[in-house]
C-alpha cells in the first residue's frame, strides 16, 4: 500500500498498468469517461478511495492486496494478503505501553535509516515529527538534516517550535516561509496528483519537499500520529457525541 498501482484492461485483452495514472493515459485507448461514483466519493471524503479512480474502467490496487491475471480469463477480485490486526493486546500498565511505543518507534526509524542516499526529516515542531527527529538523532552520529515550512500568517506559523527542536538535537536545519497566496503550484499539483485530491497541506508539503531536496534524497516525516492517537479536536467531539448517544434512550 505504500506505492500505488493503477491498471486497466483495454478491449478485454490488453493490460496497462503503472505507478501513476498519467502513465496509463499515454495509451491512446485508455478510457477517459469520468466515473460518477468516484466524483461522489471525492466530495464526501476529499479523495477517491481504492479500487476506483476518476476514470471509469481504470482501477487502483487496494493496499495489502494482490491481483492475479490469467490470459483468457475474466479479471478476478483483488485478494487481501495482509491487513492491520486490530486485536486487543494485554499490557500490564500504561508505563509498559509507553515503553513498547518508544521501542516500536525507534525500531521503525532505525529500519528507515538504512539507505545509500542522504537522509533527512520534515520538522514541524509537533509531537509526531519531533519524536522522529529525536529518534534519528539518537540512532546516527552525524547531525540530522531537518527542514521546516512556515507561513506568513502568524497563527499558522509553527517554525518557532521546529527551531527549538532543531536546537535541542543539534540538527542542520533549513526553513522557508510560504506566502498565504502561494497559488502558483495549483496547476503543478493537479498534474502530479492525477485525480481530484482535497488536502489543505498539499502546497506546503510540496514546498517542504523542494526544500529537503536541496540537501537530501529521502526524508522521514511524522504523518499518522494524530490519526493513531486521536490528536485532532474532531476526535474529542466524536467521543463526546458517542457518550451522549449512549446516555440517551435508543428511541431518540
Feature locations, PLM:
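Active-site adenylate/phosphate-handling loop in enzymes that bind or generate adenylated species
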Residues: 207-252
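Cysteine-centered catalytic environments shared across enzyme families
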Residues: 2-195, 205, 209
